[in-house]
Amino acid sequence: MAEDINAEEYPTEIHDYLTTFEKSLTSVDEMLKTMMSVSRSELLQKLEPLEQAKLDLVSAYTLNSMFWVYLATQGINPKEHPVKQELERIRTYMNKVKEIADKKKASKLDKGAASRFVRNALWEPNPENGQTPAKAKKRKMN
C-alpha cells in the first residue's frame, strides 16, 4: 500500500505511520482468518462459560473497533456516532466479567484451618497439671 504511492504524493513524515498502519492491518487480517477458520460452535464447546463470555466480548469489541477505524478513514467523527456508546457498553460488560474472574481467583477461607489456628493461638495452660506449652513439648531422653 504505502510502497505503491510515490513519496512525492504525500508528506514524508507520514510514511512511517502508513507503514505501521499497513503492518497492523495485515496482522489483524491474519488473526481474523485464523479465528474464522474454526467454527464458532466448535470453539465454544472447548471453552468454559466465563471464557465463552470473554470470547464474545472480545469479538464484539474488535468488530466495533474496526468499524470505528472505518468511520475515521471515511472522515466521519466516530465520537459522535452510536458506535461510541456500543464500545462503552461492551467495556462495561468486560469489566463485569473481569470482576467475576477476579472473584474466582480470590483466596478462599479454609474454616477448619482458621479454627485450628485460632484455637492454638488462644491456648491456655491447664492449671490442674501445671504444664506450660514449653514443658509439654520437651521429651525426656532415657
Swiss-Prot record:
Swiss-Prot/TrEMBL keywords: Cytoplasm, DNA-binding, Nucleus, RNA-binding, rRNA processing
Membrane spanning residue stretches: none
A Pfam match: Sas10_Utp3
GO molecular function: DNA binding; RNA binding
Region annotated Disordered, chain positions: 120-142
UniProt region (Required for transcriptional repression), positions on chain: 1-100
Location(s), subcellular: Nucleus; Cytoplasm; Nucleus, Nucleolus
Keyword Ribosomal protein: no
GO BP annotations, alphabetical order: maturation of 5.8S rRNA; regulation of gene expression
Highest taxon above the source species: Eukaryota
Gene Ontology cellular component list: cytoplasm; exosome (RNase complex); nucleolus
Main location: nucleus
Subunit structure: Monomer and homodimer. Associates with the RNA exosome complex.
Family listed: Belongs to the C1D family.
Function: Plays a role in the recruitment of the exosome to pre-rRNA to mediate the 3'-5' end processing of the 5.8S rRNA.
UniProt protein name: Nuclear nucleic acid-binding protein C1D
Organism from which the protein derives: Gallus gallus
Lineage: Eukaryota, Metazoa, Chordata, Craniata, Vertebrata
